[in-house]
Amino acid sequence: EWYGKTKALAEEVIQNSSIDWTILRIDQPFRNDTFTKIDTLHRVLDGMKNNKLYPQFTDHHFGPTYINDLAKIIDCVIRQKMTGLYHASSGESWTDFEFAQFINQNFNLNFDLKEGSLAEYLKTSNRPYQKNTALNIDKIKLALDFELKSIKEAIKETIL
């Protein structure tokens, strides 16, 4: 897969450089407000509002990254002069269906949410698709001087 390969190559170049470096990995970022480039949360919201949301996978896991927390993480990394490779997402693991279900409930959308299967989708597509992209954030949590918001808290802060 092109994206994954180029990302891995870029990380390798950075890690083999002779300067101090920091890499922050994230997964499925979202904001609590709208932005030009649609994010994970707003893609689901828009799909529900327009009655065009595809069935959501119950067998694919991801770890959403709340942008407000990521900004604080970046600030912490700079202040503490942290170097190395860190996972900087929420540390939570959600299926696409669970994520959409919580959005549906939180915003009282009453959308008829359908379950989908990544395994079934992959039978009809040549596109590579990781079954689990959630990240373990134990390493960075040791250095943070603040508590990350839970994804549920972050979604509740979202402005429609």
Task: Give the label of every model feature segment.
Residues 12-62, 69:
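NAD(P)-dependent short-chain dehydrogenase/reductase
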Residues 44, 74-78, 100-103, 155-159:
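Hydrophobic "lid"/C-terminal helical patch
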Residues 31, 55-61, 86-94, 143:
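Glycine-rich Rossmann NAD(P)(H)-binding loop
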Residues 17-20, 50, 79-83, 109, ...:
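Short glycine/proline-enriched coil/turn segments at helix->beta-strand junctions
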Residues 95-101, 118-158:
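Conserved C-terminal active-site "lid" loop/helix of NAD(P)H-dependent oxidoreductases
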Residues 6:
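Active-site helix of classical SDR
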Residues 73, 80-126:
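Mid/C-terminal beta-alpha module of Rossmann-like enzyme folds, strongest
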Residues 22-24, 86, 149:
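Hydrophobic/aromatic beta-strand patches that form the interior of the parallel beta-sheet core
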